[in-house]
Amino acid sequence: MASYGFPLTASSLVDWTSLTFSPIEVNGHIQCTYSPEVAEWGAPHFVKDPYLRVHGLAPALNYGQQIFEGMKAFRTPTGSIRLFRPKMNAVRFAHSASFVAIPPVPEALFLRAVHLAVGLNSEFVPPYDSRGSALYIRPIAFASSATVNLAPADHFTFCVFVMPVAPLSTGAGQGLRALVVEDVDRAAPKGTGSAKVGGNYAPIVTTMQRAKADGYGLTLHLDSATHTMVDEFSASGFIGVRVDAGKTTMVVPDSPTILRSITVDSMCRIAESFGWQVQRRAVSFTELAELSEAFAVGTAFILTPVRAITRPCTHTCIEYTADYRSSASAYTRLLETLQGIQQGWLDDAWGWTEEVQDPSSDEFITDTVQARR
């Protein structure tokens, strides 16, 4: 532990009881640049200003040449700070980069930047007793040089931003209502569905807003080729659980157009440890009526129960009557196990968590630009 007592305790300037999922100002972010002169990513800079200086003709702004990630850091009972499966985020970040001609960020640099971003903002990691709250981590990379024609960019920027957050959704107690999206497809069969790029998300915002106005907390996508198979929710993965004659089976849609969710993978591993059967396969929409429980799963949503799924074109409404508040529900068992591992009150049998390193031992560069007020 460093002489100044790393990690710092949770800041008294933050009202930890009223966190949302909206950004609040922190100490700064980590930033790296890639230039053709050296053909590699440069050293990390700690930048206090949350605003980025980007040319208006940058391909990221004009052609959507950008990628992002989502991950979290948690404070443990001993006061240390843990990351959850960060190497999987590094792998997925490189996978996304391959779709949009961005030089891959080496795993070592990705992890170093994440450790620095969290470590230099350690007082913004929520207290251990604020269950469900965490420091949200948003790595991004984008083409930042000025390029008008659709051609390879020269310069790229990689950043890691952080902010303390509460869970995006608590599931409204007994679950959210989901609407099957019928007016727009999320991803084409040979498209970018497995990459975390903005183009997979921006087109669905209007549909999500309309659904919310109609009382739906989630929007569910079917495959774009036949509209018969379940893909995923607009901003999270799908998991279903079926209990039949005392046997529990977890079903997870498997398709090349689905984002490889780290939280979904973790839930599958946890389910297997319970002795449940886990099936990663194509899941038809009609099969949803056979499920006992259904969830939206992701870094932001964590594990959010679904109360009903409505499909207007067939006048179908599938309802789930499980008591999600029951300690015996699949929802409660999965959620408590995941959060217990993430926050350190259960043993990490899989070695998923990684303790954040003291940034004082890293020779990063500090930017002198102050944050704008």
UniProtKB/Swiss-Prot annotation:
EC number(s) stated in the UniProt entry for this protein: 2.6.1.-
Keywords carried by this UniProt record: Aminotransferase, Pyridoxal phosphate, Transferase, Virulence
Alphabetical list of Pfam families matching this protein: Aminotran_4
Cofactors (names): pyridoxal 5'-phosphate
Domain of life of the native organism: Eukaryota
Induction remark: Expression is up-regulated more than 10 fold in toxin producing cultures.
GO MF assignments: branched-chain-amino-acid transaminase activity
Keyword Transferase: yes
Chain positions recorded as pyridoxal 5'-phosphate binding sites: 92, 232
Record-level GO BP terms: branched-chain amino acid metabolic process
Gene3D superfamilies: 3.30.470.10, D-amino Acid Aminotransferase, subunit A, domain 2
Database matches in InterPro entries: Aminotrans_IV (IPR001544), Aminotransferase-like (IPR036038), B_amino_transII (IPR005786), BCAT-like_C (IPR043132), BCAT-like_N (IPR043131)
Pathway assignment: Mycotoxin biosynthesis
Modified residues (N6-(pyridoxal phosphate)lysine): 196
Note: Gene clusters encoding host-selective toxins (HSTs) are localized on conditionally dispensable chromosomes (CDCs), also called supernumerary chromosomes, where they are present in multiple copies. The CDCs are not essential for saprophytic growth but controls host-selective pathogenicity.
Protein family: Belongs to the class-IV pyridoxal-phosphate-dependent aminotransferase family.
Function: Transaminase; part of the gene clusters that mediate the biosynthesis of AM-toxins, host-selective toxins (HSTs) causing Alternaria blotch on apple, a worldwide distributed disease. AM-toxins are cyclic depsipeptides containing the 3 residues 2-hydroxy-isovaleric acid (2-HIV), dehydroalanine, L-alanine which are common for all 3 AM-toxins I to III. The fourth precursor is L-alpha-amino-methoxyphenyl-valeric acid (L-Amv) for AM-toxin I, L-alpha-amino-phenyl-valeric acid (L-Apv) for AM-toxin II, and L-alpha-amino-hydroxyphenyl-valeric acid (L-Ahv) for AM-toxin III.
Protein known as: Transaminase AMT5
Source species of the chain: Alternaria alternata
Gene: AMT5
